[in-house]
Regions:
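A beta-strand edge to alpha-helix "cap/lid" segment located at domain peripheries
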Residues: 43-120
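Alpha-helix C-capping/helix-to-loop hinge sites
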Residues: 5-8, 28, 72, 76
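Short, aromatic-enriched amphipathic alpha-helices that serve as compact interaction elements
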Residues: 1-13, 20
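Hydrophobic alpha-helical context, especially transmembrane and signal-peptide helices
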Residues: 2-3, 29, 84
Length: 120
């Protein structure tokens, strides 16, 4: 189900994503303290979100069970680059709930440089 969610997101036809969302779907963004209620609101928000080009989604990892899953996805429109960590709840073949985190990259503190290697 999560693979299909991201496949549909990659079409940039965000109303098509409604096919895998429950009508009472809820998405929570704890970092900005926002909640989106309903598959239609999810589609409209993504349709109206300003972008510099089509959104491209690169799946880094998906794991879980038929009822719960987690994905780590790189998202870009060619200018904006982000990483989404999404926690999915699935029931009756539909995504019913998501909690999504959009972590911001930051520079590592200098004082631990001798213990780590850079990821590029």
């Amino acid at each position: 189900m999560v693979q299909e969610f991201w496949r549909l997101m990659a079409t940039n036809d965000f109303h098509a994503v409604e096919a895998v969302l429950a009508q009472d779907f809820i998405l929570e963004w704890p970092q900005s303290k926002e909640r989106i209620r309903g598959a239609t609101n999810f589609a409209l928000l993504n349709t109206e979100y300003p972008a510099h080009g089509p959104w491209v989604f690169t799946i880094n990892r998906i794991f879980g069970s038929e009822n719960e899953a987690v994905s780590d996805v790189f998202v870009t429109d060619g200018v904006q680059n982000a990483r989404a960590i999404s926690l999915f709840t699935i029931a009756h073949g539909k995504v019913t709930h998501m909690v999504e985190f959009w972590p911001e990259p930051y520079e590592a503190p200098f004082d631990r440089a001798r213990f780590v290697e850079r990821i590029e």
